[in-house]
Swiss-Prot record:
This is E3 ubiquitin-protein ligase ATL59. It comes from Arabidopsis thaliana (Mouse-ear cress). Keywords: Membrane, Metal-binding, Transferase, Transmembrane, Transmembrane helix, Ubl conjugation pathway, Zinc, Zinc-finger. GO terms for biological process: protein ubiquitination. Belongs to the RING-type zinc finger family. ATL subfamily. The chain crosses the membrane at residues 22-42. A zinc finger (RING-type) spans 97-139.
């Protein structure tokens, strides 16, 4: 029979309590750190999503603004589009609505695009133009282009006319100088011809004078002999 020394005996309850204390000491700081990191992550995510649109110079997009905003033509402009009544003998290029792909029926009211002449169902084109400003078939814009500044155009035309007049004035002396140069060249050529003729005449005169001088010398020699 064995006896346990009471001095070295450690009850089991004390070991379990020590294990629990150790686990608590280790796990609690880890949990606190995880909670703090989670809170910081949530705060940072919220700060990124809640952008101050007013500081960026824009507006805060809300569901009401997006639902009521019209990206296309206004209702007043849509109501001003010409309305035509479709007939079988009516000369239209389209016999089918390009929006709903439905055929036109006799005596049916259609709306016509003033820029291209294409026709559509009134309900279809009205729904289309609430979010678009172009014809659904040819994509031609229904918004008129801004008028051209006529004063700016007139200034450009006047400046171009002045430039052309200046160019003509500058070309006239050039043409005149060219004609003068041609005349001068012709005069020089005529002068050269005259000088050549004068040289020829002088050479003939020299030859004649030499011949006469030779004849005189021969006559004088004959007299002396």
């Amino acid at each position: 029979m064995s006896f346990i020394d009471p001095r070295t005996y450690i009850p089991s309850n004390s070991t379990e309590s020590q294990i629990l204390k150790f686990t608590f000491i280790v796990c609690v700081p880890i949990c606190v750190i995880l909670i703090v990191l989670l809170v910081l992550y949530i705060m940072r995510r919220n700060s990124n999503t809640n952008v101050d649109w007013s500081s960026l110079g824009g507006f805060v997009p809300t569901n009401n603004n997006l639902s009521t905003a019209e990206l296309g033509l206004s209702k007043d402009i849509r109501e001003m589009l010409p309305i035509v009544i479709y007939k079988e003998s009516f000369t239209v290029n389209d016999t089918q609505c390009s929006v709903c792909l439905g055929d036109y029926q006799a005596e049916e009211k259609l709306q016509q695009m003033p820029s291209c002449g294409h026709t559509f169902h009134m309900e279809c084109i009205d729904l289309w133009l609430t979010s678009h400003t172009t014809c659904p078939l040819c994509r031609l814009s229904l918004i008129p282009k801004p008028s051209v500044d006529l004063s700016h155009q007139s200034i450009e035309i006047v400046s171009s006319i002045e430039n052309t007049n200046g160019g003509e004035a500058s070309t006239q002396p050039d043409s005149q100088s060219a004609t003068e140069a041609i005349i001068h060249i012709d005069d020089v050529e005529e002068g050269n011809r005259d000088s050549i003729e004068v040289v020829k005449e002088s050479e003939e005169n020299d030859r004649n004078s030499v011949g006469t001088s030779d004849g005189c010398c021969s006559c004088r020699l004959g007299e002396k002999a």
